[in-house]
């Protein structure tokens, strides 16, 4: 609404305010700080949730964990193929646009679904959205990057290896991993790769070992007074991510200027139709078909009670 109101100019000026992180030689607009910085916290929480499900939840078995992975492949491939079939030609470079899922939107859908979706389906959608998003980041890095800086890629790999070494040494101090996570974020940014990937990586690599549950009894049904570091951090960051980061992200990224000229141009554009068909038709159909084929081949197991309508809804 603001983007199409008299406040539009101030809105866009505000989002384009320059933020200088001179100590690490990084210049960001406010919009990029939100999308690259704050959203890293969101992705960290998502990574923690998936780690919890992989260790003791709905993704604990190999066949359960493989389900969102295989579904995501179909959900990326078919939209790209549909886009190429409709747009193609000189617009071939846009095939990656309908590939990605807006993970923040996916989480919003989970909230709206409430009790109508089982815990298993919610976990499936969350994992699917994360894999889909990571896939899109990798596609952009591999096919559309102007050239990643190898030295920073090596630094990023070093940060990931450092996490494994620290865990092997039994280091559990959270601030140590926070420092490594910051270094990983900087390395990915400097390498030309979307730095929010650092959040997912650090979330997935968080050690799932027991700590005291004092002051965190609301997080889990604790019987022995302990919970895992994953659960503790998830509880510590969840509210901040859900009630501050996501609303700010939505406010900053929903500013789409609408005009009759823009709408007419979109209607006449094969690129717009390719993106639309890829997302609206290709995404749910790709997820549905690959999931069904994988289940028939006994490669994966979908969440208990999953119906066809729910599977299509997940892809939408």
Describe each PLM feature range.
Residues 31-43, 90-104, 145-158, 196, ...:
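Structural signature of hydrophobic alpha-helical transmembrane segments
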Residues 32, 51-66, 90-92, 119-120, ...:
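Interfacial helix-loop-helix linkers and transmembrane-helix boundary segments
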Residues 1-10, 253:
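Alpha-helical transmembrane segments of multi-pass membrane proteins
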Residues 53-80, 149-158, 259-285, 310-316:
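Entry/N-cap segments of selected transmembrane alpha helices
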Residues 44-60, 107-118, 161-172, 212, ...:
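C-terminal ends of transmembrane helices
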Residues 78-79, 98-124, 132-138, 286-289:
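Short helical (or helix-break) motifs at transmembrane helix termini and adjacent helical loops
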Residues 176-183, 187, 198-306:
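Predominantly late transmembrane helices and immediately cytosolic-facing juxtamembrane segments
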Residues 113-208:
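Functional cores that coordinate and move charged inorganic groups
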């Amino acid at each position: 609404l603001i983007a199409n109101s008299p406040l539009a100019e101030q809105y866009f000026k505000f989002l384009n305010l320059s933020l200088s992180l001179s100590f690490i030689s990084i210049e960001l607009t406010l919009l990029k700080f939100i999308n690259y910085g704050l959203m890293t916290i969101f992705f960290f929480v998502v990574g923690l949730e998936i780690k919890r499900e992989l260790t003791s939840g709905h993704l604990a078995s190999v066949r359960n964990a493989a389900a969102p992975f295989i579904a995501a492949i179909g959900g990326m491939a078919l939209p790209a193929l549909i886009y190429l079939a409709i747009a193609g030609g000189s617009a071939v470079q846009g095939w990656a646009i309908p590939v990605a899922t807006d993970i923040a939107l996916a989480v919003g859908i989970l909230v709206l679904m409430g009790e109508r979706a089982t815990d298993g389906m919610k976990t499936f959608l969350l994992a699917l959205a994360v894999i889909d998003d990571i896939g899109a980041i990798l596609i952009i890095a591999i096919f559309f990057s102007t050239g990643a800086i190898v030295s920073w890629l090596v630094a990023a790999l070093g940060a990931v290896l450092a996490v494994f070494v620290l865990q092997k040494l039994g280091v559990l101090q959270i601030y140590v991993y926070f420092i490594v996570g910051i270094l990983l974020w900087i390395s990915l940014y400097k390498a030309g790769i979307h730095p929010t990937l650092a959040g997912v990586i650090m979330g997935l690599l968080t050690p799932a070992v027991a700590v005291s549950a004092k002051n965190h009894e609301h997080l889990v049904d604790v019987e022995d007074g302990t919970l895992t570091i994953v659960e503790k951090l998830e509880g510590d960051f969840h509210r901040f991510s859900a009630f501050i980061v996501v609303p700010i992200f939505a406010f900053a990224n929903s500013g789409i200027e609408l005009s009759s000229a823009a709408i007419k141009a979109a209607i006449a554009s094969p690129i717009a139709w390719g993106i639309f068909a890829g997302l609206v038709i290709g995404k749910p159909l790709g997820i549905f078909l690959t999931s069904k084929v994988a289940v028939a081949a006994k490669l994966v197991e979908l969440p208990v009670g999953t119906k066809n309508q729910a599977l299509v809804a997940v892809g939408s």
